Amino acid sequence: MKVRSSVKPICEKCKIIKRKGAIRVICENPKHKQRQG
């Protein structure tokens, strides 16, 4: 899980989701998981 000021999808399978007011990227590849904070 990376915490970044700007979250971007890295590959085609990355999905941007808003959860509890935080923007997250979820993906099949665990290295692509990100959240904004």
From Swiss-Prot:
GO CC terms: cytoplasm; ribonucleoprotein complex; ribosome
GO function term, MF aspect, one: structural constituent of ribosome
One Gene Ontology term from the biological process aspect of the record: translation
Alphabetical list of InterPro entries matching this protein: Ribosomal_bL36, Ribosomal_bL36_sp
Record-linked PROSITE patterns: RIBOSOMAL_L36
Pfam families on file: Ribosomal_L36 (PF00444)
Keywords: Ribonucleoprotein, Ribosomal protein
HAMAP family, A to Z: Ribosomal_bL36 (MF_00251)
Family label: Belongs to the bacterial ribosomal protein bL36 family.
Protein's name in the database: Large ribosomal subunit protein bL36
Protein source organism: Lachnoclostridium phytofermentans (strain ATCC 700394 / DSM 18823 / ISDg)
Gene: rpmJ
